[in-house]
A protein has these predicted regions:
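Beta-alpha junction/loop-to-helix N-cap segments that form part of ligand/metal-binding clefts
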Residues: 43-48, 58-126, 200, 212-216
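Short beta-strand elements in bilobed, periplasmic/extracellular small-molecule ligand-binding domains
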Residues: 61-73, 130-131, 179-194
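Hydrophobic alpha-helical segments within soluble ligand-binding/sensing domains
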Residues: 134-159, 170, 193-195, 214-215, ...
Length: 362
């Protein structure tokens, strides 16, 4: 079984020196890292590179990790070319792109040739016949966890208002299903633009399932919102609203996000590797979580390689699926994270949010 503890995994004793005087030569594996050098997340590539290299350096005495970095882009042509270079590199394992559209292309063209680890949240339909191993919770896991938290307070009525885009519809469906399954007596769903219909309802709990349309909704319904006992937001609209005149109406509103896995030591190492000490001024920046999961993925891959004693794809997958975190299996058989803990955020009178507690859906 694989166990990661702290920033460095213990792999002592996996292989033996051929003599007491000679230093053993570490076995070698190859990892392809699909970085984001273009598109809206163009800035992430340099972060992914630095994190992967840190992990490779930390593993150097036990397994030599050779890395190749490729950008899958957002077109079939770019993805094919990037994967062709990864295959020419003879990679044993792949870190997936951090955007779902690019990850779908990679899944389409790899055809289960090697295990794939996802280091960022991807859509639930991103998979091969052999599942991606996800080091972050999926969007659906986060939404179902929110439904679990809400249901534990036993509300009698819950109203979900949702936007007309795909995000709003998907979140609404997951929430409605999760709440109903958990015994909430009355769950209503209404489009976010149906303001007259919404005003006629007096729900105990309101969930706003939208992104950009949330601002318009809050503005139009500022006089109605105080009548709701508890408001919840979703990851897509968890934001700072201090600039808006209606911000105070969000006081007491709650939301959840997966707990930040990074440490001050890791953030400092990353900033130093990048030569960008200014990054430390915002320790909650999302780039640190991406960097950590990239670092973690390379460590996990190296340990799986040693456990499997082979670069055979099936052996590597088995070793990865059997990996543990805090004494428990890390992944479900589907490749999803088995246990995810959350930070609960609450809004103050100024329309900004801050951590106020923890939640575990397990």
């Amino acid at each position: 079984m694989i166990v990661l503890t702290g920033l460095v995994i213990s792999v002592a004793g996996i292989y033996l020196a051929t003599s007491s005087l000679a230093k053993p030569i570490a076995p070698s594996m190859r990892i392809g890292v699909m970085v984001s050098d273009s598109g809206s997340l163009y800035f992430a590539g340099v972060i992914q590179r630095a994190a992967a290299k840190l992990a490779s350096s930390d593993l150097a005495e036990t397994v030599k990790v050779n890395l190749v970095f490729e950008d899958a882009g957002d077109s079939v042509f770019e993805a094919r070319n990037a994967l062709a270079r990864v295959k020419a590199f003879d990679a044993d394992l792949l870190l997936a792109p951090i955007e779902s559209d690019s990850a779908r292309l990679v899944a389409q063209f790899t055809k289960d040739q090697f295990p794939i680890i996802a280091t960022a949240p991807l859509a639930d339909d991103v998979d091969n016949k052999q599942p991606f191993l996800r080091l972050t919770s999926s969007h659906s896991q986060d939404i179902i966890s929110l439904a679990e938290m809400i249901s534990r307070d036993r509300p009698a009525t819950v109203l979900i208002v949702y936007s007309s885009d795909q995000y709003g519809k998907d979140v609404m469906k997951s929430l409605a299903f999760g709440l109903t399954l958990r015994g909430v007596p009355k769950v209503q769903v209404i489009g976010i633009n149906e303001l007259s219909a919404i005003r006629k309802i007096r729900p105990e709990v309101l969930i706003v399932a939208s992104m950009e349309q949330s601002v318009g909704f809050f503005s139009s319904m500022r006089d109605w919102l105080p009548q709701v006992e508890q408001i919840y937001l979703v990851p897509g609209n968890l934001a700072n609203y201090t600039a808006y005149p209606w911000a105070k109406t969000l006081k007491g509103t709650k939301a959840i996000l997966p707990k930040d896995p990074t440490t001050a030591e890791f953030r400092s190492r990353l900033a130093s590797a990048l030569g960008r000490p200014s990054l430390l001024s915002n320790p909650k920046a999302p780039i640190f979580a991406l960097a950590w999961h990239t670092y973690e993925a390379v460590l996990l891959a190296g340990q799986a390689f040693l456990e499997a004693k082979s670069a055979n794809p099936d052996s590597l997958r088995t070793a990865l699926l059997n990996s543990k975190s805090k004494g428990e299996l890390r992944f479900q058989s589907s490749g999803y994270l088995r246990d995810v803990d959350y930070t609960v955020f609450g809004y103050g009178v100024l329309g900004s949010y801050a951590p106020e507690g923890s939640f575990s859906p397990n």
